[in-house]
Amino acid sequence: MAVEEGLAPYIPYLFKGVFTGIESKRKKALPQDLLRSLMTASLDDPELRKTRQALCLMFQFCGMAFVDFAHLKKENVRGGVLEYKRQKTGTPMLIEVQSTAWESLRELSSDVGKDSPYLFPFLKGIKVGKEAYKEYTSALAHFNRNLKRLARVCGVSIPITSYSIRHSFAMILK
């Protein structure tokens, strides 16, 4: 406005090279040794064991996002392959289920009701619209709380969320 009104001179590229975004100071990926300790910890608490199983599966499924993991349906696993569409983008995905993942997959999915379309016990599958979204956000918050509990039990002091699993997988691939 000041330039348009003649109160200030126009200076081309005045802010060239100036970063105007928000810089993230916190690393989202976990170091491999801490990730390994979360994946291999001996746990008595059944809820933390399920959280660890989900963490391991999400990592083995190529750093799968929690939203995709929670929305997997029983029909998405066929012939040793996990086939689904990303929730965020609709991109079709094919992931071979490794032999190391089957036991965790069976155990985690054993808590799902027979009438539920979902592979894992995070969502019930009976809500629609805003209620379905509320159910998902509640499941995500619950999972993240359990990840933090798991980290505390394992002596991991770095902040962790479901996104940390995805980011850790990507960083290890680099």
Annotated model-derived regions:
Residues 1-3, 97:
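Non-catalytic DNA-binding core/recognition domains of DNA-processing enzymes
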Residues 3-11, 110-116:
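Proline-centered turn/helix-capping motifs that create local helix->coil transitions or kinks
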Residues 10-66, 70:
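Basic, Lys/Arg- and aromatic-enriched nucleic-acid-binding interface segment
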Residues 16, 71-108:
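Conserved tyrosine-mediated DNA breakage-rejoining catalytic core shared by Y-recombinases
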Residues 43-45, 83-96, 130-139, 157-161:
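Short, contiguous acidic/charged loop-to-helix segments that flank catalytic cores in large enzymes
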Residues 44-46, 144-174:
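Short, basic (Lys/Arg/His-rich) helix/loop patches that form interaction surfaces
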